[in-house]
Structure formats: C-alpha cells, structure tokens
C-alpha cells in the first residue's frame, strides 16, 4: 500500500512546484510589464527643460481676431488666457523701435499674476520685469510701447478678461522650435526638431524687415494670376495670431489697387494647394468657402511697400493651420507642414 501511495505524493509535490513556478513567472512578467509601461510613460513626457507642452483650451480668435487662447501653468501658477502670436506686431508701431531706443520689454512676474490681480499693484508694470524660463511671457502684446499705454485703461482691460493673460510672442518663436496642432489643441516649445520631422513637408521661409510692415516671415510664391491673366507674385505670410477671416474663409490682400473681385479664384486655389498645400499628395480644402462676401481686404499706403517687388500679400492664419500640424523653426527660417 505504501509503495503505491508514494508516486501519488511525488506527483502532488511536482504539481505544487510547477504551480509555484508559474505564479512566480506571472508575477515577474507583470512586474516587468509595469516597469516597461512606466518607462514608456516617462518617455512620452519629455523633461520640462527640453520640451514645454501647452494645451489649448479655447479658440478665441473668431470672437476677437486676436489669436488663440490656451492654458499654461508657469511656476505652479495657471494662466488661463495665453494669446499666441507668432509674428504680427501692431501696425502703428515701428517694428524697429526696440533696437532704435534700446528698448527693454517689461514683463509681469508670472508667479505673482494671481496674487496681483485686482490690486493697485497690477498697474505697476515695472515692478514685475522678469523673464520666466527664458520664455518672455508678456501681458497683452509682444510689441506694446509702454509710453503709449494709458495704464488705467490697460488695468481695466485686464480686469475684464476671464483671467490674466500673457502673450507668447515672436520672441518665443525666435528661441524655440514651436510645434502646433490646432486640431488636437496642443502646442510644444522645444529646443530641437522632433524625431518625426521626416514626415513633414519642409518649406523655406523668407525673412523681411521692411519698415512699417508688421509681419516678418513669409513663403515666396509665383504662379498667381489675376482674372485678366496678368501674372503676380505673392508673399504668403504666416500668422497664428490673426485667426478671424483668414485662409479659406478669406485672405488679406495688401495691394493698394487690387480687390478680390479682380483675382482668379482658381489661380488662388492653385497657389495655395500647389505651393503651400503640397505637404501632402492630395488635399480637400473647402475652396468653395472663399466667398467674396466673407473676404477682408486690407489696404496699406503704397509708400509702405515696394510694389515693384510685391504684387500681393496673402495672410494665412488659424483657419489654414487647422489643416496641418505646423512646426516653426525661426532660427533656420524653416516651416514644416504635415496634413493632420
């Protein structure tokens, strides 16, 4: 009897050993997967010093024609309304003013934005001159001249906002590679181009510092024609700070003697699709939305432009960039587009 029971006992012991080994293996696998997942999660969240993610909350542009408001946390303080403006200065301000006057922009301390709202100290701009994380977040606009501001009106404007706002202006674009995806509501400031840059269409930008002209980077295009067949060249300016009435809802033509009724819409469509929209092989932009009734024509005095060089300027704003992931590399004067 005992000889017959022995194999059974050995079999049970073996089964227990196998079960224990299986359990240990499963535990080890789970721990490994957990660690791997932690590493993957960490890899997906680059360090703040290298890349700064900013999430958009609201597209405010069509309400105020000023840009895009979003939410960002700086030094632990949440700024609810941050106006993104990648290059447009106020037209009544000399763009070279800062250099001529050795002008120093003054900036609110971002870590005291909340504390100072609603107090008399809000009007004391000079007390909060600081550059935070090298980003130069600015209240209001990148190029406001302090000597032209009625500080009482300015304070009243700030009180009327949902919360204090700061401008991510052209100075930020000059320092960082800026990636923006309007469709998914995010922006990233980085010290380098992303690893996925090979998926983007690279488009060289031109830099112009023409006095009196508010925008400084553009894409030079040819093949643009009027209805009478006359050829035109055009500078396509890229301005995320001007959201209302741009791109396919309208475009801004700054030629003094030219109106949209004179422009061959199919030629304009070809211009945009072939030279800007060539980021992908096939595009389906709503060209039919280019209704003359919704277009805005901005006329600038001829003395401010060299019309022998420039026939027309087209301003592409937020409406256009909704169709793309866009990367601005101002240091190298490059624009990258990928259809989203």
Where are the predicted features?
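Pepsin/retropepsin-fold aspartyl endopeptidases
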Residues: 34-340
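Bacterial Sec-dependent N-terminal signal peptides
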Residues: 1-48
